[in-house]
Amino acid sequence: MTKLRKIIHIDMDYFFAQVEEKANPSLKDKPFAVGGTNPKRGVISTCNYIAREYGVRSAMPTAIAMQKCPNLILLNTDFAKYKAASAVIRDIFYSFTDKVEPLSLDEAYLDVTDVKEYKNSATLIAQAIKQEIFNKTGLTGSAGVAPNKLLAKIASDINKPNGLYVITPEQVDSFVKDLPVKKLFGVGKVSQEKLKTMNVETCLDLQQLSLATLLDKFGKFGNNLYSYARGIDNREVNPVRIRKSVSVENTYLEDLKTLNACLEKLPSLYDKLTSRMTEEHYKSIVGIVVKFTDTKFNKTSLTRVAKTLDKEAIKSLIIELYQKQNHPIRLIGIGVKLGEVEDRQMKLF
């Protein structure tokens, strides 16, 4: 019989904004956002919950955010501050278990299956972790507890902020039935729209499709869909998780017709990229990359060997790549290559 696992997913609440709020308590009762300080061309990185009540959201253009909330306070990002808080939180995770898989500065998976303390209760362990984080940093996070990574991550988002949601093995079947397929790991807009054309919007709908049908429509990803729809996820929490790259990209509603228009998108992309990187990522950078997709859906990219993440170096790549374009730009992606340099044509996307 397979041993049931006990997985916790911790996701810090509005992390950048909460760190700023802790550093400056006068912000606590005011709507504010981090990033996007250029009112005309900026993009919001994150915001506090008061700002969200006005409809402000992450990745929203600052101009739109200011329309929704004219009194919105805009703060520059301070990654040194966020990394310092993240390091404290990471140490707390490791004080409970060695099986920690960091995903970014503000979230991680923990496998507490073999933790004997707290009566071997994942729920009690999650509560203790949340309390320890608050005691040492004054910050709150939300936790999801479940038999696997898929469900733990979904659960951590249910009772935000400062929430805890538990899915026991006995509750898995009933929980997934009404779960929207868009919540499943790996299901993006394209897959979601494709499933919608097949009259699939919930996991119960997805369960009606055979494995053969899913493999035919989605290739190898069909295996994942078949399992995820049933609340099955055999991915391990990998404490030595090796990533070959970290990258971000954005598709723009209005085509970027000039070089300046492309360069104006760099600050928000750069902030988004750095927010996804951990201290370990910074230590293992071996290259940087820029990718474009134009209005004809032609994809081009440039890579350079590099030891550090340098905004000016990425800017020069954008300029060089743009000069090779014949059509307006629809998508821009930037990223870093991690590990050993295999060749000059490093593929991140």
Curated annotation (Swiss-Prot):
The protein, known as: DNA polymerase IV
Cofactor dependency: Mg(2+)
Pfam families in the record: IMS, IMS_C, IMS_HHH_1
Stored NCBIfam families: PRK02406.1
Domain UmuC: from-to ranges: 7-188
Cofactor note as given: Binds 2 magnesium ions per subunit.
Coiled coil: none
UniProt keyword terms in alphabetical order: Cytoplasm, DNA damage, DNA repair, DNA replication, DNA-binding, DNA-directed DNA polymerase, Magnesium, Metal-binding, Mutator protein, Nucleotidyltransferase, Transferase
The keyword Metal-binding is annotated on this UniProt entry: yes
TM segment ranges: none
Family to which the UniProt record says this protein belongs: Belongs to the DNA polymerase type-Y family.
Catalytic activity line of the entry: DNA(n) + a 2'-deoxyribonucleoside 5'-triphosphate = DNA(n+1) + diphosphate
GO biological process: DNA-templated DNA replication; error-prone translesion synthesis; SOS response
Cellular compartments per GO CC: cytosol
Binding site for Mg(2+): 11, 106
HAMAP family for the chain: DNApol_IV (MF_01113)
InterPro entries found in the cross-reference section: DNA/RNA_pol_sf (IPR043502), DNA_pol_Y-fam_lit_finger_sf (IPR036775), DNA_pol_Y-fam_little_finger (IPR017961), DNA_polymerase-Y (IPR050116), DNApol_IV (IPR022880), IMS_HHH_1 (IPR053848), Rev_trsase/Diguanyl_cyclase (IPR043128), UmuC (IPR001126)
